[in-house]
């Protein structure tokens, strides 16, 4: 496979220099409601739920299958693109793959990649504190969607200005998306998914639009689950002192982003999980494929020994879905990494 994995020595040095996260906290604050956002999110979800109803009553099967395909494409655009490539730089991508991922990410419409990366790097640096945009210490609803319905916490504004995203601003592909955000993202996320069923196989405008909205809110909410459910429910086999958890349900919904305790301990691993090539981690397979054809390279991983030592030192003792799980077959434990 055409990939260059970072050496264990470098990774171990990075591990030793990792700054301990602040203790999860949520100080008292007065929420300033953004009514425009509430109305917008309410419409999206009402329209999406109506789209779900139409799927069972009048929508053509071609439209349903097309929307599911777009759901998968958009989700990979977020996980393999804005998350693993641009936020954490877990691998490098040549221009064709960057363009492809930018378009796929636009289909998800979760702000521009530049804004997404800024918020996500802030989230990792100040995870589950008042400087975290979607602080899970404030509960499920706030970390899931509530943070988007109110003004940003002062600490988020202050710390956000200190986050280095110069590498992202210097990327011409992402600058294009930022400059033409409204027409470009609007066309990719809403217009084309509506027009294609109408002109492609004679779907009604009502069905096409509302099923497109259903696909959109599904993409939103499965991503939101990483911020909420995967920070509240689950085991913590790698670091028991942080909120991010291993949540299998979230992994299924997001195609592999629910191994969140691992990800917060080893954010530079392109697999975002210890067992990165299992069936729940489609973005890893996506990246591996493009590494095979030469569009992705310098894939970074973590050594098994490093994972084992960190788990023993700071984990909660569960170590589910890991090589130290007592139920893991011996032949898997003895398998050598790539």
Curated annotation (Swiss-Prot):
The keyword Lyase does not apply. Its cofactor is Fe cation. Its main location: membrane. A motif (Histidine box-3) lies at residues 260-264. One of its GO terms (cellular component) is endoplasmic reticulum membrane. Pfam families: FA_desaturase. Residues 318-338 are annotated as: Disordered. InterPro entries: Acyl-CoA_DS, FA_desaturase_dom, FADS-1_CS. A motif (Histidine box-1) lies at residues 83-88. GO terms for biological process: fatty acid metabolic process; pheromone biosynthetic process; unsaturated fatty acid biosynthetic process. It catalyses: an 11,12-saturated fatty acyl-CoA + 2 Fe(II)-[cytochrome b5] + O2 + 2 H(+) = an (11Z)-Delta(11)-fatty acyl-CoA + 2 Fe(III)-[cytochrome b5] + 2 H2O. GO terms for molecular function: acyl-CoA 11-(Z)-desaturase activity; iron ion binding; stearoyl-CoA 9-desaturase activity. The chain crosses the membrane at residues 33-53, 61-81, 97-117, 181-201, 212-234. Detected in the pheromone gland. It is found in: Membrane. A motif (Histidine box-2) lies at residues 120-124. Its EC number is 1.14.19.5. It is a multi-pass membrane protein. Keywords: Fatty acid biosynthesis, Fatty acid metabolism, Iron, Lipid biosynthesis, Lipid metabolism, Membrane, Metal-binding, Oxidoreductase, Transmembrane, Transmembrane helix. Catalyzes the formation of delta(11) fatty acyl precursors in the pheromone gland, and has high activity towards palmitic acid and stearic acid. The histidine box domains may contain the active site and/or be involved in metal ion binding. Belongs to the fatty acid desaturase type 1 family. This is Acyl-CoA Delta(11) desaturase. It comes from Spodoptera littoralis.
């Amino acid at each position: 496979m055409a990939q260059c994995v970072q050496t264990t020595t470098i990774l171990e040095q990075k591990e030793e220099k990792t700054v301990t996260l602040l203790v999860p906290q949520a100080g008292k604050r007065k929420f300033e409601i953004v009514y425009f956002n509430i109305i917008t999110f309410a419409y999206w979800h009402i329209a999406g739920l109506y789209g779900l109803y139409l799927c069972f009553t009048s929508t053509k099967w071609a439209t349903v299958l097309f929307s599911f395909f777009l759901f998968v494409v958009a989700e990979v655009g977020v996980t393999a693109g804005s998350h693993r490539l641009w936020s954490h730089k877990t691998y490098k991508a040549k221009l064709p793959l960057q363009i492809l991922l930018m378009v796929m990410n636009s289909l998800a419409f979760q702000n521009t990649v530049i804004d997404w990366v800024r918020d996500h790097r802030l989230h990792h640096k100040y995870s589950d504190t008042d400087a975290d945009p979607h602080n899970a210490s404030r509960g499920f609803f706030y970390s899931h969607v509530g943070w988007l319905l109110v003004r940003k916490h002062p600490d988020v504004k202050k710390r956000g200005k200190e986050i280095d995203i110069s590498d992202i601003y210097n990327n011409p592909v992402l600058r294009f998306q930022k400059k033409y955000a409204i027409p470009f993202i609007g066309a990719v996320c809403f217009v084309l998914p509506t027009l294609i069923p109408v002109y492609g196989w004679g779907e009604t405008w009502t069905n096409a639009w509302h099923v497109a909205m259903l696909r959109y809110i599904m993409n939103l909410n499965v991503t939101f689950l990483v911020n909420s459910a995967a920070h509240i429910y689950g085991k913590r086999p790698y670091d028991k002192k942080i909120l991010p958890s291993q949540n299998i349900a979230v992994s299924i919904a997001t195609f592999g982003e629910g191994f969140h305790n691992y990800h917060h301990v080893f954010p530079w691993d392109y697999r975002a999980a210890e067992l990165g090539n299992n069936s729940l981690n489609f973005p890893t397979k996506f990246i591996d494929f493009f590494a095979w054809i030469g569009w992705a390279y310098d894939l970074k991983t973590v050594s098994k020994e490093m994972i084992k030592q960190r788990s023993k030192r700071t984990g909660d003792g569960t170590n589910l879905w890991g090589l130290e799980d007592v139920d893991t077959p011996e032949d898997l434990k003895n398998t050598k990494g790539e």
